[in-house]
């Protein structure tokens, strides 16, 4: 996975259902603080059991989530998000997310997650 120090765009983030209702200035601030990363097919974005301090949204490609004991847990497509449990609860990653195709994700750090994203889960 190679981070490109290019922020996500407001347009990209507005396609994420969780984020779509954010006010324009808030989604713009979030976009500036997210880092875009290209992921090769077959590569893991996060690994179950690892420390997790980033929240991710899928911008392109198809990824799968799986757990060692339960197997496949789902497919992630553009507009989906993952990685919220670890930073929200301070626990290790609960699943491995791997790219099935070349993919692009954008992620933010725990501070940004706590400030902008976490309140969206309170509803």
Region locations from a protein language model:
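Cytosolic regulatory regions built on CNB/CRP/Popeye-like sensor folds
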Residues: 1-123
